[in-house]
Amino acid sequence: MMRPVVVKEKRVNESHIHAVEDEVRQAKTMDRDIVKHAMKQSVAKLNPKVMIKNPIMFVVEIGFVITFILSFFPSHSSSIPGWFNITVSLILLFTVLFANFAEALAEGRGKAQADSLKQSKKDVFANVVKENGEIVQVSATDLRKDDVVIVKQGEMIPSDGEVIKGLASVDESAITGESAPVIKEAGGDFCSVTGGTMVVSDEITIVITSNPGESFIDKMISLVEGAARQKTPNEIALNTVLTSLTLIFLIVVVTLPIFTNYLGFQIDTAVLVALLVCLIPTTIGGLLSAIGIAGMDRVTKFNVLAMSGKAVEAAGDINTIILDKTGTITFGNRMAHTLLPVGNETIEQVGKWAAISSVLDETPEGRSVIEYVQAKSISYNRELAEQGEFIPFKAETRMSGVDLQDGTKVRKGAVGSVIEWVRSQGGTIPKDVNQKADFISKEGGTPLVVAVDNRIYGLIYLKDTVKPGMRERFEQLRQMGIKTVMCTGDNPLTAATIAKEAGVDEFVAECKPEDKIAVIKAEQDKGKLVAMTGDGTNDAPALAQADVGLAMNSGTTAAKEAANMIDLDSNPTKIIEVVGIGKQLLMTRGALTTFSIANDIAKYFAIIPAMFTLAIPQMEALNIMKLTSPLSAILSALLFNAVIIPLLIPLAMKGIAYKPMSSNALLGRNLLIYGLGGVIVPFIGIKVIDMIVGLFI
């Protein structure tokens, strides 16, 4: 009997292994394709019309052109050998190519995601309901906003819309990657459906909410492709600073021959170009775009769609997070918290009958009762319940339970309903039932009475339980200097209990939608940036007001349009990860900028003595690296300047390691690692390269 099971498990495991191996092979193939495409694009981006968008690398490209021309038409007064000019020009060319490759590689990852999304946009037909009731089949591309469409089991939802009739299970794996279907129904906050998803059961009628080219998938494709990627304010500000530095150094280098002529010696044009390239911040200039694109890519990998890079950056500067209690801090499902016996009954008796009444109950509450009883090691006869007839919960009876084969009737449900049922069986009501029910209600819980025939045994205290690990996560946010505010419709007593248990900094009890806007504005008036999550139409104003609004994909169209981020997994706690990604983006940009500028110190000690030692022998004192020769020093500095860009591409793409800590601690850590490291690494790198170059010249 056991042999077939073992074989089946083996086959399942083998098929699972093969599937994983296929995925790994596909991933490697895709990575190779992305790299090949990036290499081609790095050459295509040499077009001056493209390069001028990056002023720093554009200057390097001009330097390449000048030195390349000098390789064939050298100056008559030049004392530099011909091979030096061509070597410098090649190094500058590869410097530009490496920078272009970094940007193209980041863009390629986004385009790969866009291609997979395009595959989900299949040619489908829609059953459109005309005003006269006639059903006409048309192509999804012909649908317009406000068209009414019927979608049956097994059919693809043709475009974005909202359910106006019916209820169905929808497979959203093409969008979210989550295989479990979700329930969509008319009315409420779960009526929004997305084009490209599949109805797997029942039938729904939807009204189309977008025109062709404006659907959710279309927006996703446009965003991840980065075709219309706008630079963020911080990126523009940093780019302006770097461009200004480049302009200053350009003026210095152009005017330098005037001073050298006065001192009685000349500097070759190729050496001046090399000096300029070593002075300007080419490292961060070559990686800046890649860092921004990769930051958006990391958010997308978390199944979060950011409407702009500005939203991701804002997440990194967040000071306050507004969180709903239900579904975010707590499970949102009432879970069994404790058992309260009445009269002379015992907890074991209450647990036994509560479990028997819940064995066949598939609701979250019913399952939580079984889990609680098992955790408390209370024994009960499961087979007895399984052999009985399950009585499902109904709005009319407000009870559920089981009728056992021996005629025993077990019920659990609302206090008033069960008391009335017990009385109808001829039973009496213990005096402390209502007292204990009131206690649970005042605590913010839900009381369920457990009864068998004409006898009440006790109550189940259902509580909206705080998710595991929330206290630790809020502590991490606190270390980052971020305040958490919990909004809940519960009374102040219950809200205070949940807030204390979860570890949030503040709470707003009996909170209405308009109260959330007031909380957000109050924080913003203090100069703070605020993030919040939401899924309902009533959350839309607050999502729009927040600096970072994360809407749930399962929510309404209004909520998604108001937010600047959408979580495809509909997990409200993901706002914490989004904040982390935003901080990682800002830290990566800041760290590499620090590293790039610190690099220049070592380059100064390499190239300045090489330029002036012959005319000013005292400058030899600055040659602290004891480089082989002036030409070797210049080439070594240029080679390091070029090679460091591809070496830092993985760091720019992945982002620097981020640990929750205060801003001051973070600044000190990064200055130590990337500031001091940015000084030490070039000294070592240039010296090693010089030793190698010295073997050939």
Curated annotation (Swiss-Prot):
Task: State where ATP binds.
Answer: D361, E365, F393, K394, A395, E396, T397, R398, M399, S400, K412
EC number of the protein: 7.2.2.6
Q: Where along the chain is the active site annotated?
A: D324
How does the record classify its membrane topology?
Multi-pass membrane protein
CDD domains associated with the record:
P-type_ATPase_K
Q: Which family, according to the similarity comment?
A: Belongs to the cation transport ATPase (P-type) (TC 3.A.3) family. Type IA subfamily.
The entry's protein name is: Potassium-transporting ATPase ATP-binding subunit
Taxonomy of the source species: Bacteria, Bacillati, Bacillota, Bacilli, Bacillales
